[in-house]
Amino acid sequence: VLIVDIWVPTLSGIYVENASGDIAFSDTLTVSDFRLDSYSSTGNYQLKLKEGIATLAIHNGPADLKAEGNVGTLYLYGVGYGKIDCLQLKTENAYINNKGTNGFYVHPISVLEATINGSGNVYYTGSPATIKKTETASGKLIHL
């Protein structure tokens, strides 16, 4: 087991490719724009985010992602097999593209736009004023 602790004053993104391992934030990251991209990787990603824009993408592979905190705008993208759980990440605007086989979970306040091109569902809590959905596969948009 290898554990690496990284301490930085700010962090704008994380890129993971062909890797196996977990990522966990011990404290909340406050940043105007953050991006996570995971390609062909396994592991559990646990993020704590505040403010700004968050783009979280599991391009392929079985990595699972869980995020908490508050952000202004959330972009979620997934083609893999992993679960993306952002129920504890409140966001004003959520833009979702689920092409994968597992569920995405979000908590939008104002806007929810979900494109579902796979068998994975998009689950949401709250009562966003604007909801737009495009379902071209067996996955559905489901209110919890």
What residue spans do the PLM features occupy?
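Second-shell loop/turn segments in exported
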Residues: V1
